[in-house]
Amino acid sequence: MLVQQGCDFSAGNKLNGAYVFNGNDFTTGAMIGQTSGIPLNSNIINSNKLLGNTDELNIKGIYSLGDILEDNGYKQILMIGSEAEFGGRRAYFEQHGNYGIFDYNSALENHSIPEGYKVWWGFEDEKLFSFAKDKALELSKEEEPFNLTLLTADTHFTDGYVCELCNNEFPDQYSNVLSCASRQIEAFVSWIQEQDFYENTTIVICGDHLYMDAVYINKCIDPNYQRKTYVNFINSPIQQKNFTNREYSTLDLYPTTLASLGVDIEGDRLGLGTNLFSDKQTLIEMLGYEKVNSE
């Protein structure tokens, strides 16, 4: 199991994860929160603009993960199986880090997928992981360090996408999709671990936001269970200092990701996020989730 190989900031064997604040509870908001430490609220952009394709996402005044890595010589690639313009993702990642973008339209243009091919949001995660292997090998042969970011989509609501790798293990479709996604991610991580570049590579796995299908949630999840997003840092050169069950949000992943690369962060805070490898308290640990979320 991948969780046994990495760090999710728990004290024992119980799986931990990140709380999600308002403004970070949809894909674009989640990706911005995890890379800049801020919630994406109406003071920044009208959320209605993020419901389709847009290039109007212009967030000034932030210094994001992508900005920092670009300034330190990293080559950065974002790979997604949908259209990057959806929700303003292309605009954000090009403005903050000068990411090269490989998306559904890129795959059509370079004939990685056949003309007219479209399933689910564009192309399925099985293809995304295959394309990502080729890109990782290409990047590893260059002199610059690299940041390769993938956004999977097969587990998106409603019910997820059943690909050719999915088994019929469970009575409902979404559980089968979840199981398939877990196997694919584990296989991709195992592949990375077999490559020469792995020794100097940190892997960060994180969910963007909570699943939104109320029918599945009410049927399959205990109402007393505290839902969080999955978080796992694998092969980081530094170790956790505070060996308790950390209470943290996806905003804390911004400084924590930098710290996982060996970056020394003065004060161990960036944006509204706290470096979880440090002994500094997060906003949730200081004030509680409900208080912070209401602000």
Language model feature labels by segment:
Residues 1-295:
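Solvent-exposed soluble domains appended to multi-pass membrane proteins
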